Every structure is written in C-alpha cells, then in structure tokens.
Curated annotation (Swiss-Prot):
Monomer. Binds 30S ribosomal subunits, but not 50S ribosomal subunits or 70S ribosomes. Belongs to the RbfA family. It holds the Pfam family RBFA. PROSITE patterns: RBFA (PS01319). It comes from Rhizobium leguminosarum bv. trifolii (strain WSM2304). It is found in: Cytoplasm. This is Ribosome-binding factor A. InterPro entries: KH_dom-like_a/b (IPR015946), RbfA (IPR000238), RbfA_dom_sf (IPR023799), Ribosome-bd_factorA_CS (IPR020053).
Amino acid sequence: MTRATSSAPSQRMLRVGEQVRAAITQVLQRGEVRDDVIEATVISISEVRMSPDLKIATAYVTPLGVSDHSVVIEALNRHARYIRGRLGQQLRQMKYMPEVRFRDDTSFDNYKKIDELLRSPEVSRDLDGDNDEQ
C-alpha cells in the first residue's frame, strides 16, 4: 500500500517553520548579526518553509525601505551559518538544526499587481457588467 503524497506542507513542517521564523526574527531584532547592511535595514520575515525532512529552512524576507533587495538577501545568506548557530541556542528541542536560506519575498509585489489589475477601468467595467446580469 502506498501512501498518497501531497504538495501541501504537513502540520509539523508548518509548526517548525513558524518556530524557526520566530527565532530568526529574535536574532535579527537583537542585532546579533554584525553587518552594516543588515543593521541599517528593517527586515520582515513573512514565512519560513521547511523541507519535508526539516533539514532546510527557506526564509522569505522583505527588506523595508531598501530599493535593492538583493544586497540585503546576499548579506543574510553570507551570515546564514552564524544565524543557524544562534538558532541552535533557541531551538534545543530539534534533533537537527536546519540549514537556513534566505529568499526575497515577492508576494507583496504580486498582491499589488493584482490590486492594480482589479482597479483598472477595463476590469471594473467587466465586474460591473456581471453585477447587472444578476
């Protein structure tokens, strides 16, 4: 009998991802990472996705007030091993400390594009036409 697999993360992956997100946030808020770029930037961590074996944590971050996100993402990835070590002190219940990878969170940009599309005159006209038919 084979087990059905789904692409949705398990409850355990979600729970551990949230714990890792909170721990990374604390490390960054305390200013434990000594890097001029990171210290000068407000960083929002929207989500941490865990691999199924819980050995890789991909943190989706949004640097606020910075036009070039790649500079901040590169700085975070340079210090990923140090951040991983700091996580080990906070997440003692984990058997393996996950490798941390930082990626730019583009979901806000996607939401903004969708909102702009919905507010465009063409779409508004189509939506109003649908309401008239009902």
